[in-house]
Amino acid sequence: MSRIKSAFERLNGEGRKALIPFITAGDPDAALTLPLMHTLVEAGADVIELGVPFSDPMADGPTIQRASERALARGMTLRKVLQLVVEFRKTDGKTPVVLMGYANPVEAMGLEKFAAAAAQAGVDGVLIVDYPPEEAAAFGAAMKAQGMDPIFLLAPTSSAERIAHVAEIASGYVYYVSLAGVTGSGALNVEAVAERLPLIREKTGLPVGVGFGIRDAATAARIAGIADAVVVGSRIIEEIEKSTAETACANVKALVADIRRGVDEVKK
């Protein structure tokens, strides 16, 4: 059983929802990424989404774009991201790690080579933002051949056909983008998300995570009431951005622990 599936089954048995925080690898620098990953776990993360920095992150708002720019300026690469996962796995063999990024770095390495290297490093799932599900058969097959979960985005604008297609090829969990925009944008309409999730659950038995626009414990609690997982990214990156190297881990831990408390207000 994959680490992702195991995590969701454990949480389901405990009557709890998953918390999935996102950070960008190499932001603010490579030396702090590993401590931040362990900090996320200490604060209550069930799965870590680790962003692979890219020069043109079209789905990301200004906050995560700046994180990518900082990481790239300090020399972060896809190979170095994988090495960070190797280091993480030396002391954490339980927490699932999902790489989230764009197609270009993966294709530059070669899909099969990337899949093998990621699996060997200890990656559990991969989400490529700019792979349309309809064109992702090779990606999905390559991930599954290496025992990893191909994870896909669904949005408020996703058609019934796209939802059905994602249900066929995805594993691990489905990531529902609660806003039709870039990360960190707009106000989250929880009622609109609640109306949309049953349409997704009609098509798939996979857990559904919801992200984009979740900034505090209260909103996390509301999303946890309707979704299987709460994904938080931009708010954590903001905390890193305004912290020093000395205070980043403590500040992120306090933020994520507070959001964890919000998520845990909800019982299945």
Curated annotation (Swiss-Prot):
Top-level division of the source organism's lineage: Bacteria
Active site (catalytic residues): 49 (proton acceptor), 60 (proton acceptor)
Pathway: Amino-acid biosynthesis; L-tryptophan biosynthesis; L-tryptophan from chorismate: step 5/5
Record's catalysed reaction(s): (1S,2R)-1-C-(indol-3-yl)glycerol 3-phosphate + L-serine = D-glyceraldehyde 3-phosphate + L-tryptophan + H2O
Top enzyme class: lyase
Assembly information from the UniProt record: Tetramer of two alpha and two beta chains.
Family: Belongs to the TrpA family.
Function: The alpha subunit is responsible for the aldol cleavage of indoleglycerol phosphate to indole and glyceraldehyde 3-phosphate.
HAMAP family: Trp_synth_alpha
Record protein name field: Tryptophan synthase alpha chain
Source species: Dechloromonas aromatica (strain RCB)
